[in-house]
């Protein structure tokens, strides 16, 4: 699909008031369900404890490459000048002293530092997996390799980018008045560009979920806008009010840093929730929605799709599943897939497609009923796509399950206790 068609599609969706209102309600529910403010508070505390080990890893990577040694101080100054409030700038001196005293750390101290860093990275991954409704995390080895790759390559790319920018801006073109103005504008824009690119990469890499670029970009844009508002608000407040300095004195840098980290995480997580909502939201007309309690109907249809795909030697990716079964929401689909994977009825291939792992002819219906814990609805309700072959098969199976229940559930509750001892004759 071309970019023009994609933009036209989004414009048409915005004009659809019902779709827009439905997405607004869906987004608000996701914000509440994700409990982002509590998650940001937890991440803020763990991030504070991980600052020193993170700095050790970052600058240790740069020290391993002599070509980047001269850029360590420039990278540090760039980070603290553009991303950290001025009142918390004293933290930079503390980090520098910690790096200078690195050789004095004991083995136990180094283990504690590495453990705090791994705990922070694990908490970040868990939070993003929760936002994207991912039930199963990556294997531990894969997780560690991703952490290490992000830290090392991210550090080298940041230093290389600064070196490249310095080389470009040293060209004769930028020595003119207009060129100097352009270079100054670029350096002013650089922090926001760095934030935007980093957040997009975080959304794409950290969660155990295939996040599309078209969903990550708006989420990252929202996060950057919120972070810039936070930085402006900090600058305005700290420049006009001296309450923190008066109350905490020399220790004022710590609460300011903690609050700044918390609000930064709130911004990043709100952007992540927007990106997750955009990928999970599917507008369903009333006739295409599963009635509450009829999830088992969707499960039976889903298994029919997998059976048909297996006959043709194919698997199904999640986009294909949602296209074939429009009554399934992304959340319900993820829940069903995770449950079927847990009982080893489904598995994923190397391309990420879902495949049947067992023959449905030897899987009793009772196993699905017990493991997935889905209710069997007694009442009859209009069901979407009931007239196609999968709907007919699922509806027939559902009817067989609930017929015996109807007669049992029709009796009065009092009849259950007519033969208790001690009752009057």
Curated annotation (Swiss-Prot):
It is found in: Cell inner membrane. GO terms for cellular component: plasma membrane. It holds the Pfam family Virul_fac_BrkB. It is a multi-pass membrane protein. The chain crosses the membrane at residues 48-68, 105-125, 154-174, 182-202, 216-236, 250-270. InterPro entries: UPF0761_bac (IPR023679), Virul_fac_BrkB (IPR017039). Keywords: Cell inner membrane, Cell membrane, Membrane, Transmembrane, Transmembrane helix. It comes from the Bacteria. Its main location: membrane. The keyword Transmembrane helix applies. Belongs to the UPF0761 family. NCBIfam families: PRK04214.1 (NF003256), yihY_not_rbn (TIGR00765). This is UPF0761 membrane protein XCC0860.
